[in-house]
UniProtKB/Swiss-Prot annotation:
A Gene Ontology cellular-component term: extracellular region
Tissue localization of expression: Detected in the coelomic fluid.
Subcellular location: Secreted, Extracellular space
Main location: secreted
TM stretches of this protein: none
Note: May be produced from vitellogenin or creatine kinase by limited proteolysis. Does not induce hemolysis in human erythrocytes and has no antibacterial properties.
Sorted UniProt keywords: Mast cell degranulation, Secreted
Function according to Swiss-Prot or TrEMBL: Pro-inflammatory agent which mediates the degranulation of mast cells thus evoking an inflammatory response. In vivo, when injected into rats, diminishes the pain threshold. Induces dose-dependent paw edema in mice.
Entry superkingdom: Eukaryota
Protein name: Echinometrin
Length: 8
């Protein structure tokens, strides 16, 4: 779930 990490 790297996409969620983008939020960071």
């Amino acid at each position: 779930l790297r996409k969620l990490m983008l939020q960071r």
